């Protein structure tokens, strides 16, 4: 009898713990990162699931969310009024989101389905990056549309959503892959932001998802409602002209955190031209992870071309997905994202800054620091206790050991494919030293980690720092 009672109490405790709300998020004091309400660093590791609410039933949604939680994602980006004819094509239960496509008349049955998915995500420790609408509903530059938003109904809809999800674990993402080309577009965005703030009382952060190659900073950087900048560096595979723009937003004033909310997806037609460039691979999605982080981003979003659209053989495909979403969630790139998170969390988090000075340029600079797919980037903490250099390929390079302020440097190789670290050796923290990645000449990436020996940091990627 006693054992039964103890078992019941244990199960009850587990249930209560699972139901505990996720902590609120806020911008860090230095305006570079996100932290929880008690100041703990928050690493945004997002997955792109634009059609989650629209195309999946609850059972499939739960299976998807469990898969992402197991892979240590922290944010799921999903859209209430979805891109793929989300106003007129019913969801998995046969419900449409709005009565008569009127934003002031949301369907209770449709949003009850959204509620259930948000609740399950939160129970699994996942925040929702919640897009109230896709952009074709306010700028039908392309897509199904129709345009349904005005300044007045956008504010009403925003307030309704804010009240409904005030206590949920989420981040609001306005925009939706369309440019804010006119004053009307921008005023609709501002109105929806006002409504959200009024509805949730300021409980949740707000950002804006732009179109390809653009940023929220283009139109809204100085506005109070925009808590951090989101970029869409887009579906090209080259650093130059795309991922180098993360640093541009990092350097803006006033200072705001920056995130790449849509880099190249795994198994996506590269630059939308598969006949010329083929489809992206895991290595193509790993490179932007480290490019963005080392250029100053506070986190990163991953995407898979089949998963964003939740494609199955029963659905019309968009741009030739290679496999059903149920297979795509098992692709290697998704599992490898967590290693980048682990690496960042294994060193002091809130003092990290870009550090291009840690790389010694070669005489031919298109070799190192490089260009195109083969760009070397570096980061460090502002106290000089560690530094990292991302090598996108097996090309030797020279690092400045003096970026570490201690007397001695411990060097490691960190494998972005496995998350394993291997110690190289200990050197004086002065001068320059050449390093050759473990797979010289091969198209395999590595991270060189340099630590101040006196700090006694654990192996890179270790969770020993308690995050």
Language-model segments: residues:
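Bacterial N-terminal signal peptides
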Residues: 4-15
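Active-site mouth of glycoside hydrolases
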Residues: 22, 27-240
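Structured core elements
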Residues: 77, 93-95, 259-260, 301, ...
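Aromatic- and carboxylate-lined catalytic core of secreted/periplasmic carbohydrate-active enzymes
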Residues: 40, 254-257, 266-268, 281-425, ...
């Amino acid at each position: 009898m006693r054992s039964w009672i103890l078992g019941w109490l244990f199960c009850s405790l587990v249930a209560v713990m699972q139901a505990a709300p996720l902590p609120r998020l806020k911008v860090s004091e230095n305006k570079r990162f996100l932290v929880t309400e008690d100041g703990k660093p928050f690493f945004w590791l997002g997955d792109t699931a634009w059609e989650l609410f629209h195309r999946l039933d609850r059972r499939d949604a739960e299976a998807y969310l469990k898969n992402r939680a197991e892979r240590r994602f922290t944010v799921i980006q999903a859209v209430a009024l979805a891109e793929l004819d989300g106003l007129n094509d019913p969801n998995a239960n046969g419900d449409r989101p709005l009565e008569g496509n009127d934003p002031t008349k949301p369907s209770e049955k449709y949003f009850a389905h959204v509620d259930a998915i948000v609740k399950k995500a939160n129970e699994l420790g996942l925040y929702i990056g919640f897009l109230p609408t896709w952009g074709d509903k306010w700028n039908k530059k392309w897509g199904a549309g129709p345009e349904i938003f005005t300044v007045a109904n956008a504010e009403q809809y925003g307030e309704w959503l804010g009240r409904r999800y005030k206590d949920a674990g989420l981040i609001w993402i306005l925009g939706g892959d369309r440019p804010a080309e006119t004053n009307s577009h921008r005023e609709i965005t501002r109105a929806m932001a006002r409504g959200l703030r009024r509805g949730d009382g300021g409980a949740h952060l707000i950002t804006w998802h732009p179109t390809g190659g653009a940023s929220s900073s283009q139109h809204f950087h100085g506005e109070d409602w925009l808590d951090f900048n989101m970029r869409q560096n887009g579906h090209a595979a080259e650093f130059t002209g795309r991922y180098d723009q993360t640093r541009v937003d990092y350097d803006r004033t006033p200072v705001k955190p920056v995130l790449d909310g849509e880099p190249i997806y795994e198994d996506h037609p590269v630059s939308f031209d598969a006949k010329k460039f083929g489809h992206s691979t895991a290595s193509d999605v790993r490179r932007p992870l480290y490019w963005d982080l080392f250029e100053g981003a506070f986190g990163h979003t991953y995407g898979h071309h089949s998963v964003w659209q939740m494609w199955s053989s029963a659905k019309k495909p968009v741009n030739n997905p290679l496999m059903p979403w149920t297979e795509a969630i098992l692709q290697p790139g998704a599992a490898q994202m967590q290693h980048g998170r682990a690496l960042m969390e294994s060193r002091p988090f809130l003092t990290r800054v870009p550090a291009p000075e840690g790389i010694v340029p070669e005489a031919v600079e298109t070799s190192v620091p490089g260009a195109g797919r083969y760009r070397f980037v570096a980061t460090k903490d502002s106290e000089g206790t560690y530094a990292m250099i991302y090598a996108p390929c097996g090309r030797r390079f020279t690092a400045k050991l003096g970026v570490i302020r201690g007397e001695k440097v411990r060097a490691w190789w960190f494998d972005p494919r496995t998350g394993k670290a291997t110690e190289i050796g200990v050197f004086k923290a002065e001068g320059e030293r050449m390093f050759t990645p473990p797979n010289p000449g091969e198209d395999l990436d590595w991270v060189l980690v340099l630590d101040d020996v006196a700090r006694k940091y654990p192996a890179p990627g270790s969770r020993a720092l308690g995050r």
